[in-house]
């Protein structure tokens, strides 16, 4: 049986989030949380909370042993881009693209 959790509209680029997702894919849940705790990246905290949310979903359903869960799948999709303008010299303005992403995780028992 699988449990899922997702984080929508995370204010981080998909390419940067995929670097963190690749580190925990296939790992035991406890090992993944330890890895993310000491990883010095903005996305690591988001993915850690997402995995903990999926574990809480498994506890709530009461159909799985939480200690035997592992990260079966984790993927990052690109979300909508927030377009902003940054004022520049002599009345000009440059466009700034603030990227978002959707992070999904699936946990399963070993």
From Swiss-Prot:
Which keywords has UniProt assigned to this entry? Ribonucleoprotein, Ribosomal protein, RNA-binding, rRNA-binding
Q: Which domain of life is it from?
A: Bacteria
Q: Name one GO molecular function term.
A: rRNA binding
Record-annotated membrane-spanning stretches: none
- Biological role stated in the UniProt entry: This protein binds specifically to 23S rRNA; its binding is stimulated by other ribosomal proteins, e.g. L4, L17, and L20. It is important during the early stages of 50S assembly. It makes multiple contacts with different domains of the 23S rRNA in the assembled 50S subunit and ribosome. The globular domain of the protein is located near the polypeptide exit tunnel on the outside of the subunit, while an extended beta-hairpin is found that lines the wall of the exit tunnel in the center of the 70S ribosome.
Q: How does it assemble?
A: Part of the 50S ribosomal subunit.
* Protein name from the UniProt record: Large ribosomal subunit protein uL22
């Amino acid at each position: 049986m699988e449990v899922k959790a997702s984080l929508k509209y995370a204010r981080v680029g998909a390419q940067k989030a995929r670097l963190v997702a690749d580190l925990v894919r296939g790992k035991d849940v406890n090992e993944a949380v330890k890895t993310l705790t000491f990883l010095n990246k903005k996305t690591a905290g988001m993915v850690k909370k997402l995995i903990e949310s999926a574990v809480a979903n498994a506890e709530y359903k009461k159909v799985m042993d939480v200690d035997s869960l592992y990260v079966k799948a984790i993927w990052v999709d690109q979300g909508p881009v927030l377009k902003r303008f940054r004022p520049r010299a002599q009345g000009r303005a440059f466009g700034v693209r603030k990227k978002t992403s959707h992070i999904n995780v699936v946990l399963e028992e070993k």
